[in-house]
UniProtKB/Swiss-Prot annotation:
The lineage of its organism: Eukaryota, Sar, Alveolata, Ciliophora, Intramacronucleata. Residues 70-74 are annotated as: G2. This is Elongation factor 1-alpha 1. Residues 153-156 are annotated as: G4. This protein promotes the GTP-dependent binding of aminoacyl-tRNA to the A-site of ribosomes during protein biosynthesis. Residues 14-21 are annotated as: G1. GTP binds at residues 14-21, 91-95, 153-156. It holds the Pfam family GTP_EFTU.
Length: 442
């Protein structure tokens, strides 16, 4: 047994037809946890449907369908490994809810693969003002995904095929817009690939002798492994709460920061009720403790299913326990709201697992969305493309944190008209004054 491989969570972004599914499917197909039998089955099914060319994308479509049907999808199917690393693809944006998922994320992405279609006309469509490519890159950057590799896909369909001139042209343009978003393109790898043919995915392509850089896999392996927030106090947003016969109340969720241990007295915010954690379970096995990234169920004594619910946050009562939030100030980027956002606007906010209406109490500043520099104080409104500092107050009890202290609880999506209209990063919080047992305000 050698040293255990390091693990990275990847998010795959890019325009809708850039070939994300094919490229991602190819990685999983070549390096993943899918056995040959399953792949043969997929190939046969896609051939029967007359979609033989989609065999890699088909891998992903099948996984998506299963993922949408139930939560018990075998997560191995979304994993692949290289010689040095394990990777999990935490989201591939085929979903309408991709933006929401990326923010409230089932998991924080450590790095991104930005897939660009290099075919004639395709690149221009993806990068145009309305293109999703820009939005996704800005989103990834705002949400703290600072490492990225650019995969220039469909090099087999440039004119002429595998054109170095086309590669250079696109690289220049993508670099310009990534630099505006905040990335440092000079430090990034731009890998020319064909997700379908397999050029430069694992092995250097003989079709592009002019390219001297790393393959896609080698570029992924050059990402730095982030430090997991294990030393921070515990924060565990609840996804569900179950009542299990003979055991009792079992909250379920993912440890975002710190460590959950049996025997710990847990405080649930925003309500403020506490109970002892009797046992911790992962994958149906009891474990002494759970670390960041672990999905767990834990048994609490003395609380009923009525006391706690999805969106509550579990924390250690003795180490910076989580509390109810009176109001918070956030750096907010308005993405695709059709009108003007003014003070008084009350959309639903998705922050970690909480889903609560919050009122935009005050528009404090308007800022340049890329540099964050203030351009106006107390603006009358913000519209799509604007950014600014906004003070919000929740309509019901809510527990959030600042992005700087507990990142996963400090970023949110603003949902309205069945879409994500804005995203925010929380900069400061005003906590509700709590009363202690004797009724005195703390």
């Amino acid at each position: 047994m050698g040293k255990e491989k390091e693990h990275l969570n990847l998010v795959v972004i890019g325009h809708v037809d850039s070939g994300k599914s094919t490229t991602t499917g190819h990685l999983i197909y070549k390096l993943g946890g899918i056995d040959a039998r399953t792949i043969e089955k997929f190939e046969k099914e896609s051939a029967e449907m007359g979609k033989a060319s989609f065999k890699y994308a088909w891998v992903l479509d099948k996984l998506k369908a299963e993922r949408e049907r139930g939560i018990t999808i075998d997560i191995a199917l979304w994993k692949f490994e290289t010689e040095n690393r394990h990777y999990t693809i935490i989201d591939a944006p085929g979903h309408r809810d991709f933006i929401k998922n990326m923010i409230t994320g089932t998991s924080q992405a450590d790095a991104a693969i930005l897939i660009i279609a290099s075919g004639t006309g395709e690149f221009e469509a993806g990068i145009s003002k309305e293109g999703q490519t820009r939005e996704h890159a800005l989103l990834a950057y705002t949400m703290g995904v600072k490492q990225m590799v650019v995969a220039m896909n469909k090099m087999d369909s440039t004119e002429p095929p595998y054109s170095e001139d086309r590669y250079e042209e696109i690289k220049k343009e993508v670099s310009t817009f990534l630099a505006k978003v905040g990335y440092k393109p000079a430090k990034m790898n731009f890998v020319p690939i064909s997700g379908f043919q397999g050029d430069n995915i694992q092995e250097n392509s003989t079709n592009m002798p002019w390219y001297k850089g790393p393959t896609l896999c080698a570029a992924l392996d050059s990402f730095k492994i982030p430090k997991r927030p294990i030393a921070k106090p515990l924060r565990l947003p609840l996804q569900d709460v179950y009542k299990i016969g003979g055991i009792g109340t079992v909250p379920v969720g993912r440890v975002e920061t710190g460590v959950l241990k049996a025997g710990m007295v847990i405080t649930f915010a925003p309500k403020g009720c506490s109970a002892e954690c009797k046992s911790v379970e992962m994958h149906h096995e009891e474990v002494p403790e759970a670390a960041p990234g672990n999905n767990v169920g834990f048994n609490v004594k003395g609380l009923s299913v009525k006391d706690i619910k999805r969106g509550f946050v579990a924390s250690d009562s003795k180490n910076d326990p989580a509390t109810d939030t009176e109001s918070f100030v956030s750096h907010t980027i308005v993405m695709n709201h059709p009108g003007e956002i003014k003070a008084g606007y009350t959309p639903v906010i998705d922050c970690h697992t909480a889903h609560i209406a919050c009122k935009f109490e005050e528009l404090l500043t308007k800022a340049d969305k890329r540099s964050g520099k203030m351009t106006e104080e107390n603006p009358k409104f913000l519209k799509a493309g604007d950014a600014g500092l906004i003070r919000l107050s929740p309509s019901k009890p809510l527990c959030v944190e600042t992005f700087a202290t507990y990142a996963p609880l400090g970023r949110f999506a603003v949902r309205d008209m069945r879409q994500t209209v804005a995203v925010g990063v929380i900069q400061e919080i005003k906590k509700k004054a709590t009363e202690d047992k004797k009724g005195k305000k703390k």
